[in-house]
Amino acid sequence: MTFLKMKSLSFFFTILLSLSTLFTISNARKFNVGGSGAWVTNPPENYESWSGKNRFLVHDTLYFSYAKGADSVLEVNKADYDACNTKNPIKRVDDGDSEISLDRYGPFYFISGNEDNCKKGQKLNVVVISARIPSTAQSPHAAAPGSSTPGSMTPPGGAHSPKSSSPVSPTTSPPGSTTPPGGAHSPKSSSAVSPATSPPGSMAPKSGSPVSPTTSPPAPPKSTSPVSPSSAPMTSPPAPMAPKSSSTIPPSSAPMTSPPGSMAPKSSSPVSNSPTVSPSLAPGGSTSSSPSDSPSGSAMGPSGDGPSAAGDISTPAGAPGQKKSSANGMTVMSITTVLSLVLTIFLSA
């Protein structure tokens, strides 16, 4: 069975090859040398110029007409063509009406069998080109004008930097020092901040969470350095030292007393309800950082609509109530779930 299939395929390809050969031969053209076919000395049109005006393909034929016995046509190589050497021709015809087939592509060189006639210009140079099949398929790498290759999109402008996981909160500092820079975007803290006591000139943020009553110590001597809301940190002098607050303070609704002259910036973002303790500045001018409720993208600065100086800061006392409401909600949900289970068991019984 396989042999029969192979035989059929061979026969089919043989037929195709024969048809293509016949089609090529049928398209072959016959050229009269010099336009008239006359193979003579001093032709009306130079053979070289005539050859340059025509396009020769494989299987085309050249027709030479001359007096039989008096002349001939020799096919030679280029060196013999230039020197009109008739002693070692590649092919020779002398029947008077000769047709020579151009069976390959490339140059062909023909001269007269009479050396004197060759020197008088009776020679012909023909260049056969290979037939090209016109290609209709477009190159896959060709790109349309104005089009661009797909690539990655460039993000617009300055992309926001990722939110910092350790933002800086305002802490107690001696007179003349400022808070550390808060230029990075800081996420909203998951715990409320209880700012420590501040001597005069320090910045005390307004907290949205319950704080415990804290009394600031007597004001130390006034520093000669003005307080600036700038985000650039400054080294504080080692002499004044702020009291250290280290104990965990329970939430309450009592106000916090701020020393005269302190500024309270207004927080622009809400904070959550778990109080934590913010460590104060260590001796020697070093600053400490803790999670805070500072707004993202800028350092803390005094606000015009915040509480005035030398006044009590009242803080909302809604956090314990919210915790109590959450506990009540959890209790109600638990009771509802138990009742639903009991009702389901009762109905299924």
Swiss-Prot record:
InterPro entries: Cupredoxin (IPR008972), ENL_dom (IPR041846), Phytocyanin-like (IPR039391), Phytocyanin_dom (IPR003245)
Propeptide span(s): 326-349
Topology within the bilayer: Lipid-anchor; GPI-anchor
Lipid attachment points (GPI-anchor amidated serine): 325
Top-level taxonomic group: Eukaryota
Region of interest (Disordered), ranges: 136-330
Gene3D superfamilies: Cupredoxins - blue copper proteins
Tissue expression summary: Mostly expressed in leaves and roots, and, to a lower extent, in seedlings, stems and flowers, but barely in seeds.
Residue pairs linked by disulfide bridges in the UniProt entry: 84-118
Phytocyanin domain segment(s): 29-130
Location(s) in or outside the cell: Cell membrane
Biased composition (Polar residues): 249-260
Keyword Protein transport tagged: no
A single GO cellular-component term on record: plant-type vacuole
Compositional bias ranges of the Low complexity kind: 145-201, 224-234, 263-312
Pfam families assigned: Cu_bind_like
UniProt keyword list: Cell membrane, Disulfide bond, Glycoprotein, GPI-anchor, Lipoprotein, Membrane, Signal
The family this protein is said to belong to: Belongs to the early nodulin-like (ENODL) family.
Biological role: May act as a carbohydrate transporter.
Name under which the protein is recorded: Early nodulin-like protein 2
Classification lineage: Eukaryota, Viridiplantae, Streptophyta, Embryophyta, Tracheophyta
Gene from which the chain derives: ENODL2
